[in-house]
């Protein structure tokens, strides 16, 4: 999805030209492989899916090459589903510690994708757990950083907001389902 996303940026900027708006902040959402770090570091402002130290280090290197700084969210796998990205909750403190070595990246929060469910309430335990993880890490850090919680999508964003989401992902609700 990296190239697809990057190709849409000029079109969106063209549509926004002439409007008195703050410039958009581009978020990259989706599993990211290290070999795609260069274009992501060059075009996006926030990467929501950093789930391993090696990926963060590569993004950091590529951001430095591009003369940019990026914000990142650390993705946590709370569903236990191997096909979903994210660090295991037990390994999250180590990933946060590794993030301190990144000079061009700043970890500003956490992100999760809960297990798919037809009832939005089924996502509540995962959202509450992510908030609890964030709060525990913030307490351990003396209240520093980790201000964002990206959780909730088109089907369950109301529950996510009730549980403290600061970023929701509602592309399907806004734009419809992706083409196959």
Which stretches of residues belong to each language-model region?
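Active-site loop ensemble at the mouth of alpha/beta enzyme cores that anchors a bound cofactor
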Residues: 180
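Conserved alpha/beta-domain cores
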Residues: 2-157, 161-163, 175-177
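Active-site-proximal glycine-rich helix-loop-beta segment
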Residues: 164-166, 171
């Amino acid at each position: 999805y990296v190239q697809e996303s990057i190709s849409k940026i000029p079109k969106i900027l063209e549509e926004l030209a002439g409007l008195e708006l703050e410039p958009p902040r581009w978020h990259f959402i989706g599993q990211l492989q290290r070999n795609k770090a260069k274009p992501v570091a060059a075009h996006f402002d926030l990467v929501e899916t950093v789930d391993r130290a090696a990926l963060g280090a590569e993004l950091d290197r590529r951001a430095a090459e591009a003369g940019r700084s990026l914000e990142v969210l650390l993705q946590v796998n709370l569903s236990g589903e191997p096909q979903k990205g994210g660090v295991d909750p037990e390994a999250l403190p180590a990933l946060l510690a590794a993030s301190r070595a990144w000079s061009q990246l700043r970890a500003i929060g956490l992100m999760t994708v809960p297990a798919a469910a037809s009832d939005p309430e089924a996502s509540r335990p995962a959202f509450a757990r992510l908030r609890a993880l964030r709060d525990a890490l913030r307490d351990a850090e003396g209240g520093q950083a980790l201000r964002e919680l990206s959780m909730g999508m088109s089907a369950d964003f109301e529950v996510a907001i009730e549980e403290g989401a600061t970023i929701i992902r509602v592309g399907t609700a806004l734009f419809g389902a992706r083409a196959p």
